[in-house]
């Protein structure tokens, strides 16, 4: 009963509270009439329509701008694609042209009938008239010229070699006696190289080239690093190497004897007294570059010149001539001056043996106009002179008796020497002549070098040189040449190396190339008259007297 009364009272109270007249709401105001409501709704609708039109115009403007940007981007993309396609096409054309050029050089190595008489397809030749149509003297004239003018130099060369070898032996022995074996470089016996020891020297005065190998004091050794041993080197540094000074017995600094000063009565059982490492500041005594472990050519030059000067002072009283340095930029360019006024030049060249081979690193060589200078004083030129001498001697055994190969080289060298004195030196040297001959010896049959074929082989040698000059390409005979007999014993790294172009300087130096080519053709033009003149006149050079 009570619960029922409570519910009735709750309903009544709720109805009173929610009555609109008792508590009116703020937003519950009823408009006065419907027309006012309709007018406001129409005004609001017009505002919405205007806003819609404005938004549609804005959207249309943005769409137009977007379309314009897309069109510009599409045009730029098409231009880029066109440019990339053009660049790619240009690159492909360049590669194609290079491939054609390489193919032309590699496959136009065949002989021309004019140059080689149709023999030996491997031999190089020319596409036009060889030697610009110039003719050399006939076989009889060449033979007479050789007998009258060149053959006599062979006997003079033998006497000169005998005299110089005896003197150099004495000089080097005096040098060794002044050296400290524990701290100074050790000088070995000399090695005769080049034309005087290959029996084709014709130029006067006769000039001997002698290699003088040297080694560092114990416990050090020389470690050569060839350009073809994996290092990345510029093209103009091919054929060079560096020589690192390392310890032959390992690092003794990790031993206590290298860190502690032992007494006079104490000796390390692992490292003797001579194996103790010198102070770091004494690396210059090992002829290394400053703050470097690599041998310095300038340091070697100074050391060798000083050592030779001291050695000569010790034996000068035994001889009736004077000894002086010939060229200041070459460490071993020496000149014997006799009291009669005559002189005898020769070159003592300090060299370092490359491992156990017959390759030698040389600090300096007589300069050729086309030769570059080392970019660094730690760059050493690799010489194949001993291998060249061995190859000529080995080849001679297979050639007919009285073979004309050296006669060809002597005549060509004679003509080049006379032309150089007439017009000045050019980029062509006697070493280029010898390189051309070595290539021909490897390609020609032994029977082609009979004495009676002197004129044909000389003509062929000059044709080879002409083609090489026109192509600006003469490969080094040993580097990268797998046709060299295995019996020569060349290091495998040298045989695997890329061929070295001795005429590469002509590609970079146009003036030198033009001068060399002009000098070569002028030499050919003057050859007949020069040979005829010297066939009737024997030079008045007399053998150099011996002391």
Curated annotation (Swiss-Prot):
Q: Where do the segments described as Disordered lie?
A: 109-129
Q: Which residues cross the membrane?
A: 84-100
Q: Describe its membrane topology.
A: Single-pass type I membrane protein
Q: What is its main location?
A: membrane
Of the GO CC terms on this record, one is: nuclear outer membrane
Report the coiled-coil segments: 32-82
Q: Does the keyword Transcription regulation apply?
A: no
Can you tell me which family this protein belongs to? Belongs to the ITPRIP family.
Task: Please give the function described in this protein's UniProt entry.
Answer: Enhances Ca(2+)-mediated inhibition of inositol 1,4,5-triphosphate receptor (ITPR) Ca(2+) release.
Entry protein name: Inositol 1,4,5-trisphosphate receptor-interacting protein
This protein's species is Homo sapiens
Q: What is the lineage of its organism?
A: Eukaryota, Metazoa, Chordata, Craniata, Vertebrata
Gene name, please? ITPRIP
